[in-house]
Amino acid sequence: MTPYRFARFRRSGNLLLGLVLVTTLGVNLSWSANGPKKADFDALTRAGWEHFYSLEYDLALHDFEKALEAHPDDAAAVNHVLDTVLYRELYKYNALDTRLYARQGYIFSKQVPMDEAVKRRIKDLSERALSLSDNRLKANPRDVQALYNRGITEGLRSTYLVIVDHSWFGALHWALAARHDHEQVLKLRPDWSDAKTIVGVHNFVVGSLTRPVRLMAGIAGIHGDKNKGLRLLAEAGKAGGETSTDARMALALFLRREGRFEEALVIVRTLKQQYPRNFLFALEEGNLLYAEGKHEEAASSVRELLSDCKHGKYPNAHLEIAYFTLGQTLRAEGKLNGALAAFQSAASSKTSPPDDRQRALLAEGEISDLLANRQEALLEYRAAIALNSTSDEAQTARKYLDKPYKGN
């Protein structure tokens, strides 16, 4: 593939690939309700997922590691630990904020500076899980549970490669492997509803690519049907299996992509009620309302979320994401002073990674310019550039150092 064609493919598929790899927002994809119920119905694992769904990753990891000690040869138990270690890091650096994947090139610019020890652990866990599944499949190629477990491991490896390493082709390889394994599961066991989630997501993604890119993908043997993808996700979501939550979240994201906001809101509000301590599900309601153009309702939703955070409802909230969303909604309403205050809160949050802080500082500068506070704007642009002089945000800030921002 020529560099030009690769660039076209990357631009066309950026949002969609991002959605493929982060559809779960950190929700379990590692065990199938249709498979053997030996390891994952014990108290430790149940407690682990309760913490996981609440974004309490350290507590979840403690429980899953104890469960793995009791079941060292279970690939699903290894996947639970792998899943938690990976998503703890992604959440730490705000790489699970779905709204950001609508930004051109974001998935390739988002920085997740993992410690090398964590990277090694992720690699070791994924290789361990793959080895356990492969050994079972050597003994019985039709071992459906092993195929399912291997597909989960492959999907997690794909997520790591694209978001952390920014390795497009490596991620694509493992994503296709995950799809293939779960398609095999469905051939052997059509009633295995949990396998429909990955297959459904991939069908939607490939089916949504631009026609030229889809033709290129077809030549490479990669096919998809957008409507089939939505149908499979709806079926997996209604089945009530272990990927039901994942399927519903993916469905909501894709419905949002299709402009079917009200349908997506119904799903997200159900998830918000089902997981009352999950900060990201609560935030997604505000994101959807903002995307639909209901800015006043979006601002109200985010304010309620921030109030709940102050009262301890969400134990591991990243307030900077919520403040940034609030800033956007107020900016869209023309409430510039309120927007400026929200962006300032986003930039000063203790949990804000440098790239998110830079984004908030750039927004601060733009609002200051709109309010005719030129000196404040210059300070904010310079502060943004100082965080990372090579980013797109820095390039934009430099432009406004020379000429004030006047609005889009």
Describe the residue ranges of each PLM region.
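Bacterial N-terminal signal peptides
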Residues: 14-28
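Short coil/linker segments at helix-helix boundaries
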Residues: 33-44, 51-63, 73, 81-142, ...
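Alpha-helical adaptor scaffolds
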Residues: 244-256, 287-296, 303-357
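Terminal, low-structured helical/coil segments at or just beyond the last alpha-helical repeat
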Residues: 370, 376-408
